[in-house]
Amino acid sequence: MALRRLTLSLALAGVLAGCNGPDGGVLDVAIIDTPENLFADGIRLSSGAQHVRAATSHGLVALDSRGDVIPALADRWIVTDDGRSFIFRLRDGDWPDGRALTAESMRAELLQAIRALDGTSLGLDLAPIEDVRAMAGRVVEIRLSSPVPMLLQVLAQPELAVVREGEGGGTGPMLMRREGDGAVFTMKPPTERGIPEEEGWERFVRPVVVRALDARGAVGQFEDGAINVVLGGNLGNLSLANVGPLSRGTVRIDAAIGLFGLHVRQGSGFLAERAEREALAMAIDRAALVAPFNIGGWEATTRVVQPGMHEDRGAVGERWAGETIADRRQQAASRVAAWRRANDIDDEPVRLTILLGEEPGHALLLRELAGQFARIGIVLERVAEGAEPDLLLVDRVARYASHSWFLNQFNCTLRRGLCSQDADALVGLALSATDMNVREAYLAEAEAQLTLANVYIPFGPPIRWSLVRGNVSGFAANPWAFHPLPSLATLPR
């Protein structure tokens, strides 16, 4: 590790002459990931790889440090009154390989990206796209089968960036040079980023050195002063960030939107029927699961779709309202006992397996969850990676704030585990509805169907954290737990 850091430091020696500290020189960033994942190609990107892709490649739009949509290859756009047409005006300039950036070439890139994502959950999010049209000059139109208010957020995903490279790098705002297990990222000149030329622009940017480290190594280097920012923390490794006084920095928690719960993978034995699957959901004290982590503001939910989405009209509420956890566990234990009697296994407990990570927080979560299940007569055991578990811990940040994203994660075509074809059919009806009230009603009904199927047992929103030294600018907590490298590379004026 010391040799790799020395290599990176030598590579930056010319850039950093006379500079020190995050305000004037290089910004050292650790992303909790493996080098293989962090610098992966293709469309199945880890969270870390999404940060790298977004720095080096752009699509029509991108995300800023607050998670808001900003111009990228398109410098402006309009949405028609019916919400079914998004018209983009491409910025001036060429592709990195010198070819002209035209509406026709952008159309071809978009269609290729959409085809590549077929069969993925992000591909399902793109299903309402009916046509991509090249209009006059640098104008591209995306036509939809029905309104998609969050389309810009979907188009800003790194997997939809155009990966074209030339001597000047890719389509994104930064140049990347690999060094060992990391890389050096530097900002391109303004004109290559599609913005007006500015004299002395170099004074307002800094190089960013990114390393792939495991959580323990990243936290250790942060505490030693070798790292300014750590990205990519989750519940599994949060306890590492809480070890010792963080006198040199701050733990920043993203108020993330997404999934955190159990997906039923095996529809046999005790989990064959929805009533027994519901028994598991009833027995969980969600607040107690997360209490050992001492996270302020985290709100448990029994809903598949996180409360507060813009389509949420209150048609689906929290389950078992008015029932105490003791009452729920009594009902759940009765169902477990009845199933054992019906299957002539009165002398054996029900055994279920779970697949989850192996970090300290996962062990703590498993211990609490196993203890709660034991109260209703179920033994919960961990299985190793590669085994087929009964239950899978889902810990996934949403791409956009909509019912559609949550429901698409359990679409039967993805073959991730148990699903509901009835819910999928209702989502399909929602996508074809041109009236937003009708669309929202279908989505609420789809959530209700998926809830009744008990194929997913929600705990609450996912937990994401970062370590950020106090004098670092360009970082903002946001619902997507996405912290763009260009924002971290930009100095305040």
Language-model features: locations:
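Structural transition elements
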Residues: 299-341, 359-363
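Extracellular/periplasmic solute-recognition and catalytic clefts
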Residues: 180-186, 196, 209-267, 291, ...
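N-terminal lobe/hinge region of extracytoplasmic solute-binding protein
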Residues: 31-81, 111
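Long beta-strand-rich cores associated with HINT superfamily self-processing modules
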Residues: 468-493
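Gly/Pro-rich hinge or "lid" segments in bacterial periplasmic/extracellular proteins
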Residues: 146-208, 214-217
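Periplasmic-binding protein-like
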Residues: 267, 271-312, 324, 450-455
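Extracytoplasmic/peripheral linker and loop segments enriched in polar/acidic and small residues
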Residues: 381-384, 406-470
